[in-house]
């Protein structure tokens, strides 16, 4: 088992406009990426659970050529709106860091 924080080269988030967030998880090499992909842990349902959005609202794409996964989903509060605690969306990857990968 490995935590995403230890297995991934990059785990980052940012706004995808004022109403959506995008999260990227990038691995060092094809072997690690393929092992993670084969587990099925990184999937729309994981992002739905971690970010409290319906799975059908999560756009999830593995990018084999970049050894990366990308997920885009609605923000719970629009960027800059009352109650927003991360106007740039750059701290929203934190819940992923402690996800266990059975690799």
Language-model region placement:
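Long, contiguous binding/interaction regions
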Residues: 1-103
